[in-house]
């Protein structure tokens, strides 16, 4: 279907399907400054992405090792039905296959967090990414998606039903993983049940869903699906199709590790606020999405974080006799810090780090407060 002429001139829209080359607007320098290695573990080396099976009695130990060393892991045995995951992927593919004129009805406006368009992070960069995205809050799913399907017909009802079922499953899984993370910090099951802050986090944790479509690219060596970044919230579940493209950054030596596309598995990324919450014992992971010449790729990020008014600081249970490494911040405050970091090249986490014992003593009382 040809692109309407008014859309072809709209700077917010790029017709990836019609592209025969990568224009300068989408060409990124420095993509190959570091080598890329296989993370499947086929060679038995140190770059195998960790796997956590929630059915394993030693799952908490595996989470601790992965969160401390990698900041990410593949999650198996999570209990989310495979047929639901397949339905979610099919629904996402169908949504991005809609005509451009229909998708543009839901375009994300400046200052908005929800809607269709480029990744939200793209506003910080002069180059464009080889991807389309759609962001919505599960709490407002039906009203958000009416922008895309104003007549609320069959496609709208089916998409909403699939995403609502997925949200129910994922929200329950998030609570289980939060408990596993706390056990990984060294708490027993009984101690976790008694931690007041754990209940506050579980009860107030909010979710956001971001859908991604990475079209096949005529010159993938020049383009990038999603710029390298860390997630800002607590932790993220990533559901990806069976086309690899997610890469994690590793030091010593610096390299990109391609996460294998394992049927039924999800990727879990530790976010910046969870690094703060655990006082740096679990660290966020720098990651990106690359594109390829032969296949489209679909992914879904299910992001968990605190409500906007809640201050996040290191858990007392994570300190283990050490001073707090970070000051208390709300999520919006931290996003403001990240904006400065993007424009200056600084580290947002370093910008909220604290160094004095007095500051540390004050901030540990603020773990999760209004």
UniProtKB/Swiss-Prot annotation:
Listed name of the protein: Gibberellin 3-beta-dioxygenase 2-1
Species for this entry: Triticum aestivum (Wheat)
InterPro entries in the cross-refs: DIOX_N (IPR026992), IPNS-like_FE2OG_OXY (IPR044861), IPNS-like_sf (IPR027443), Iron_ascorbate_oxido_reductase (IPR050231), Oxoglu/Fe-dep_dioxygenase_dom (IPR005123)
Top-level taxonomy: Eukaryota, Viridiplantae, Streptophyta, Embryophyta, Tracheophyta
Tissue expression pattern: Expressed in internodes, nodes and the ear of the elongating stem.
SUPFAM superfamilies recorded: Clavaminate synthase-like (SSF51197)
Database matches in PANTHER family: 2-OXOGLUTARATE (2OG) AND FE(II)-DEPENDENT OXYGENASE SUPERFAMILY PROTEIN-RELATED
EC class of the enzyme, as a word: oxidoreductase
Binding residues annotated for Fe cation, in chain numbering: 229, 231, 287
């Amino acid at each position: 279907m040809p692109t309407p002429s008014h859309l072809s001139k709209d700077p917010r829209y790029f017709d990836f399907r019609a592209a025969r080359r990568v224009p300068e607007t989408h060409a990124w320098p420095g993509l190959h400054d570091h080598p890329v290695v296989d993370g499947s573990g086929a060679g038995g080396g140190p770059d195998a992405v960790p796997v956590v099976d929630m059915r394993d009695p030693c799952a908490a130990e595996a989470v601790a090792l992965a969160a401390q060393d990698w900041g990410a892991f593949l999650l198996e045995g999570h209990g989310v039905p495979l047929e639901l995951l397949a339905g979610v992927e099919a629904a996402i593919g169908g949504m991005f296959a809609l005509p451009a004129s229909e998708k543009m009805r839901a375009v994300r406006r400046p200052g908005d967090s929800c809607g269709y368009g480029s990744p939200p992070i793209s506003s910080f960069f002069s180059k464009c990414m080889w991807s389309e995205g759609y962001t919505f809050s599960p709490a407002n799913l039906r009203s958000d998606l009416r922008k895309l399907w104003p007549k609320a017909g069959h496609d709208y009802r089916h998409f909403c039903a699939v995403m609502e079922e997925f949200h129910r499953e994922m929200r329950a899984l998030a609570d289980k993983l939060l408990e596993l993370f706390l056990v990984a910090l060294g708490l027993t099951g009984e101690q976790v049940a008694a931690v007041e802050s754990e209940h506050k986090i579980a009860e107030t944790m909010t979710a956001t869903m971001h859908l991604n479509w990475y079209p096949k690219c005529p010159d993938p060596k020049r383009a990038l699906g999603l710029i390298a970044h860390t997630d800002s919230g607590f932790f993220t579940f990533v559901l990806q199709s069976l086309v690899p493209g997610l890469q994690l950054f590793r030091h010593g030596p610096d390299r990109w590790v391609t996460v294998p596309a394992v049927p039924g598995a999800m990727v879990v990324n530790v976010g910046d606020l969870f690094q703060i919450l655990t006082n740096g014992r679990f660290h966020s992971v720098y990651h990106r999405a690359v594109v390829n010449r032969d296949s489209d790729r679909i992914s879904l990020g299910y992001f968990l974080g605190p409500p906007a008014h809640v201050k996040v600081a290191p858990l007392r249970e994570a300190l283990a006799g050490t001073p707090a490494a970070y000051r208390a911040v709300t999520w919006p405050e931290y996003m403001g810090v990240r904006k400065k970091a993007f424009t200056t090249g600084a580290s947002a986490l370093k910008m909220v780090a604290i160094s004095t014992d007095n500051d540390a003593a004050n901030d540990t009382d603020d773990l999760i407060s209004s």
